[in-house]
Amino acid sequence: LIKQGRITEITNYEETDKVFSMRSIDGEGLYLIPGLWDAHVHYAFDDNMRPAMNALFLAHGVTSVRDTGGPLGLVTEVRNRALEQPTKAPNVYIAGPLIDGTPNVYNDSSPSYPLLSVENNLPTSIQSNTQLLIDNQVDFLKAYEMLSEAQYLELMRLASEEGLLVTGHIPLSMDLFSAVEAGLNGMEHLRNIEMSIATNSRELLKERLSILENPDS
């Protein structure tokens, strides 16, 4: 039994006469599953692919997606169009741009690194850039690799105040356990996890911090 787009009850065939329905569908040879999720997509990554993405999602049973990083204007427009045409697009949840430090990784430097992020190179920019995303009603936030520990902790504080979940990569300036303890709700990929599970993880982190402080050395 489906009510308002949700499967609310499953009964035996012999009991179908007990269920009142405005419409019945013969399911012989068919099957029914809940809508699938794609929890990691980037509408902004490929301009040529983007026009076909919604139709491809629906054709494969994907009815909800998380856009995990892209220019705020672009992903907001994608979400708005999905809301306006719910039968032609999945439910779209957006993070806005990756919240990165300096230099930001996805900075439009090449086709492999399109502009998916916002750089935070000033002490106050984390507050202003994060507040902009909050004001534009993003569904969650995504932390990225080049954030300093101080920037990361400030991002977590702001997210907690707003009740927003934060997903992302483990910043190069931190280890996995510190990032999770600070409030990270999810990990996208397993990048940077290997250092935290090494037997000499403290030494490796110290070496990495030295490289981050002196990138040209």
Positions of predicted regions on the chain:
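Divalent-metal coordination cores built from histidine and acidic residues
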Residues: G27, Y31, L36-A39, M53-P171, ...
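Short pre-active-site segment immediately N-terminal to the catalytic Zn-binding motif
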Residues: D47-A52
